[in-house]
Amino acid sequence: MSQGVEFNRLMLDMRAMQMDAMSQPKSAAVAEVSGSSFADMLGQAVNKVNDTQQASNQLSSAFEIGKSGVDLTDVMISSQKASVSFQALTQVRNKLVQAYQDIMQMPV
């Protein structure tokens, strides 16, 4: 659950950064950003989804070979967490692609 919470926290941080950027007045000089960049945050989110999927696969494999202490409910919950996090990442990707296409179609 904490990985899903971390992903949600990253999404909220990105939204807050977007709102801050939109509320600041436009200036001619470019200021250095001291926080993490969007690319870093997106990379962290992708890595967390990857970690969730790997943990789910390991738990599934452990259950399949009959390792003691691995419960079917844990396997199913882990599998659903991995599925939901991947679907969320796919939606983020789709929104990024759509935003890129919208920008590219803007008249100059």
Curated annotation (Swiss-Prot):
Keyword Iron-sulfur carried by entry: no
Which GO terms of the molecular function aspect are on file? cytoskeletal motor activity; structural molecule activity
Q: Name one GO cellular component term.
A: bacterial-type flagellum basal body
InterPro entries, sorted: FliE (IPR001624)
Q: Where in the cell is it found?
A: Bacterial flagellum basal body
Q: Name one GO biological process term.
A: bacterial-type flagellum-dependent cell motility
| Keyword tags | Bacterial flagellum
Q: Domain of life here?
A: Bacteria
Cross-referenced NCBIfam families: fliE (TIGR00205)
For this chain, the family text in UniProt reads: Belongs to the FliE family.
The protein here is known as: Flagellar hook-basal body complex protein FliE
